[in-house]
């Protein structure tokens, strides 16, 4: 029931399936591992939905004139995270089909709130209602299968998307960590 209510609210009758999206972001990004350390950023992102994928290019301002360029992507089943000071000095370079791919596919799946036709069962998402306001969505892309918990507001729209465990980079390694995205101010 909550997913049907969401789809009826978010989509129009006869709406075509979204195949691709371009998004510009600006805001602040928490760079802290143990304490909050919010830094301004701007980015451009391209998303494809026919086979889950995205390519996010960002600049995070660490200090005036000192930017970190971040490339975060999920392409053809591979996760990519590369960050470089001034775009020249590599700080992080992770790629592959294991936990990196899993984390990046989670990001794609959670952000599908912005292109909701990607959440239709016809697009490969399996849904299981948990209660009147939440459901578990499961997505498979190639060898990666994952599930996220979606909660919906009184208006029927997505409020949160959470994973019990998503890899987080700490000291050069990946640490499983609970992870949530929050959505509000739909326009």
Task: Please provide the spans of the model-predicted regions.
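N-terminal mature ectodomain segment of secretory-pathway/periplasmic proteins
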Residues: 4-89
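Short, solvent-exposed secondary-structure boundary motifs
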Residues: 29-41, 56-65, 110-122, 137-143, ...
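Buried hydrophobic residues that stabilize the cores of well-folded domains
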Residues: 40-46, 73-77, 81-83, 102, ...
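A short, polar/proline- and glycine-enriched secondary-structure boundary/capping micro-motif
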Residues: 65-71, 90-95, 147-149, 170-174
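Gly/Pro-enriched, hydrophobic low-complexity segments
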Residues: 136-186
């Amino acid at each position: 029931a909550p997913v049907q209510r969401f789809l009826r609210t978010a989509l129009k009758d006869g709406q075509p399936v979204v195949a691709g999206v371009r998004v510009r972001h600006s805001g602040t990004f928490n760079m802290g591992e143990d304490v909050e350390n919010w830094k301004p950023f701007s980015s451009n992102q391209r998303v494809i939905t026919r086979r889950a994928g995205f390519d996010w290019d960002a600049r995070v301002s660490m200090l005036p004139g000192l930017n970190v360029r971040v490339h975060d992507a999920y392409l053809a089943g591979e996760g990519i995270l590369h960050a470089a000071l001034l775009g020249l000095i590599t700080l992080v370079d992770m790629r592959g089909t294991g936990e990196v791919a899993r984390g990046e596919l989670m990001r794609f799946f959670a952000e599908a709130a912005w292109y909701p036709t990607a959440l239709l069962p016809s697009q490969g998402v399996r849904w299981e209602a948990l209660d009147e306001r939440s459901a578990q969505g499961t997505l498979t892309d190639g060898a990666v299968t994952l599930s996220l918990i979606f909660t919906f507001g009184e208006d029927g729209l997505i409020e949160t998307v959470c994973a019990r465990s998503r890899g987080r980079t700490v000291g050069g390694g990946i640490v499983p960590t609970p992870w949530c995205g929050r959505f509000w101010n739909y326009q």
